[in-house]
């Protein structure tokens, strides 16, 4: 293959970026005092920081590879795969987010044990690890395809190298490193994605020439209803819009951990709305437009970009053409590395969280936090190694988009079905959940073995191709099979549900979850926040746990009661909650000082020359 020429300057800029990311991992490692810090960043971050880091997780290297590829092949209709998140937002905002946050759920499998039983937890643990490791494999494969036009190496060699870098960084830094570096990487990848669009328009000679170089089919916002077989509206809707998008938001442990890293349910909701309504539409343009530019160049100048060009690497090829200097090209490539890091770090960290919380901890006998933290770091490295093997398997598919689609369609449906019925149908039973996993998997395997016989009735007229049967519509068949099993077994179950055991775990019992979160009745008589100089803080060695005691005047202003949860933070908004923590309001202090426990100070690390605020959380 032809290799894009580069010099030492290019590699210097790229290596500098990688070392900065690794440095961030080392810097933020000092914040990891427990597994809650390593996995959830202390549950203290502001919505804008969470929202941008969620964007960086969703818009990963696989996004630049697969959506740019579809943009190159089919034009503007590539965006339809990225704009399907709006219709399930109310269910996410007012159902799933408050349930997992208030019930202090650390992982999806843990939710399943509390909602159903340990058998369902074990089944979901296996599925979740399969899902996350598959995502790691897709990310590694995507970056390898994007870098191959520059390096000219074998795909397998590139996969191994980037996996080592990513695994090292995440194993050191944990969730706090992920959130802050993902924020920076989110800004970088959006800017780079939009920059390549501007450079591409300039390369073509203006927007009018770009527009005129696209065919009418390239300009359509949606693909044809059921053709061609490798990219059609109905297949993409079921595979990407329903199974893929719903699975990503509801069962992806990496996204769940973002919600749980927020300082409150309100901040998690704001982050989600900002991400879906603002960041993702911009992200869609950023990840797809290099494909559109590539298509316009191929149509206008077929001697520059041939029709036979591998679409998986079109971002890199277009970037090398339109960048008018090597530093700019290096920056564009670095942004793809940023996208990889932003996706891989979250998936690796999430895999370790599931392995430690749902496999190691239940088997171990009261392991210490230090031991669990060490196991977490080791597991991060181990799942990265397994992700390399997954990437090798996915490389057998024709395109990254099809590999990702097939992966979603097979792995996601049982888990998504059990989550949805568990949240929204109180009668949904443990037996039905088990059968959904077991029988649902059997039907999925049968669909893979006999696609023409079983999937054709669901195919909406899409063409059957023997070597790649129903690339996307199989997601609909799998969802129907799993949902049917869930409904039938639930209605046949005779054992009554003990509703007292699922309080707070369904949409209809969210209020119970708020009381569970606090540990007592929620204080609805919220006063105004209080602000003061940190010099008024005094560390009281006698206070146990994360306790704060306020003078009477501050207590009256806050209208807090003993036992209420408060949020105490540095007032600098741009820190995003880095110097903050939740605490428990103790008895009114006789002192003029704000008394805090040693544990509160260790988590928040206040600067005593700054301003601090306290707000009542419940």
Regions found by a protein language model. Give the residues of each.
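Solvent-exposed strand-loop boundary residues in beta-sheet-rich modules
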Residues: 572-574
């Amino acid at each position: 293959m032809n290799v894009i020429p580069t010099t030492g300057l290019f590699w210097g800029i790229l290596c500098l970026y990688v070392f900065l990311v690794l440095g961030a991992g080392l810097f933020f490692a000092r914040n990891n005092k427990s597994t809650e810090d390593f996995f959830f960043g202390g549950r203290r971050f502001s919505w804008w920081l969470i929202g941008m880091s969620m964007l960086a997780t969703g818009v990963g290297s696989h996004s630049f590879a697969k959506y740019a590829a579809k943009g190159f092949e089919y034009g503007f209709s590539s965006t339809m795969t990225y704009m399907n998140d709006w219709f399930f937002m109310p269910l996410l905002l007012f159902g799933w987010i408050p349930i997992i946050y208030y019930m202090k759920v650390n992982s999806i499998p843990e939710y399943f044990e509390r909602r159903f039983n340990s058998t369902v937890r074990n089944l979901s643990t296996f599925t979740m690890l399969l899902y996350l490791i598959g995502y790691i494999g897709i990310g590694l494969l995507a970056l390898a395809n994007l870098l191959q036009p520059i390096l000219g190496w074998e795909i397998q060699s590139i996969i191994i190298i980037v996996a080592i870098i990513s695994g090292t960084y995440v194993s050191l830094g944990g969730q706090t490193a992920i959130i802050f570096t993902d924020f920076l990487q989110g800004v970088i990848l959006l800017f780079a994605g939009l920059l390549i669009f501007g450079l591409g328009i300039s390369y073509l000679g203006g927007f009018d020439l770009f527009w005129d170089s696209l065919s009418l089919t390239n300009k359509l916002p949606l693909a044809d209803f059921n053709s061609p077989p490798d990219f059609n509206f109905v297949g993409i809707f079921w595979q990407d819009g329903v199974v893929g998008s719903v699975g990503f938001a509801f069962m992806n442990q990496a996204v769940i951990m973002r919600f749980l890293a927020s300082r409150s349910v309100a901040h998690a909701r704001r982050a989600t709305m900002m991400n879906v309504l603002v960041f993702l539409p911009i992200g869609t343009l950023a990840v797809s437009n290099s494909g559109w530019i590539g298509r316009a160049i191929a149509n206008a100048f077929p001697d520059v970009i041939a029709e036979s060009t591998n679409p998986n690497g079109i971002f890199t090829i277009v970037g090398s053409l339109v960048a008018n200097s090597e530093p700019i090209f290096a920056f564009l490539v670095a942004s793809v590395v940023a996208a990889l890091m932003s996706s891989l770090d979250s998936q690796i960290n999430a895999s370790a969280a599931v392995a430690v919380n749902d496999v190691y901890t239940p088997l171990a006998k009261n392991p210490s936090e230090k031991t669990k933290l060490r196991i977490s770091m080791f597991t991060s490295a181990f799942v990265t190694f397994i992700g390399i093997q997954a990437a090798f398997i996915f490389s057998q598919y024709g395109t990254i988009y099809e590999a990702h689609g097939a992966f979603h369609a097979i792995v996601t449906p049982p888990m998504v079905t059990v989550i949805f019925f568990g949240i929204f149908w109180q009668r949904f039973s443990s037996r039905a959940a088990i059968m959904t996993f077991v029988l649902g998997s059997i039907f999925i395997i049968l669909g893979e073995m006999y696609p023409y016989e079983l999937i054709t009735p669901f195919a909406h007229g899409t063409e059957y191709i023997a070597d790649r049967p129903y690339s996307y519509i199989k997601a609909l068949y799998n969802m129907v099979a799993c949902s049917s099993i869930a409904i039938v077994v639930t209605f046949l179950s005779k054992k009554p549900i003990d509703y007292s055991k699922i309080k707070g775990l369904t949409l209809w019992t969210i209020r119970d979850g708020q009381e569970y979160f606090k540990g007592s009745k929620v204080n609805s008589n919220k006063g105004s926040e209080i602000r003061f100089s940190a010099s008024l803080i005094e560390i009281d060695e006698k206070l146990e746990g994360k306790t704060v005691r306020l003078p009477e005047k501050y207590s009256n202003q806050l209208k807090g009661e003993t036992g209420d949860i408060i949020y105490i933070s540095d007032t600098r908004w741009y820190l995003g909650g880095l110097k903050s923590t939740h605490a428990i309001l103790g008895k009114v202090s006789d002192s003029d000082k704000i008394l805090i426990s040693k544990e509160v100070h260790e988590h928040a690390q206040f600067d005593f020359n700054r301003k601090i605020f306290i707000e009542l959380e419940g």
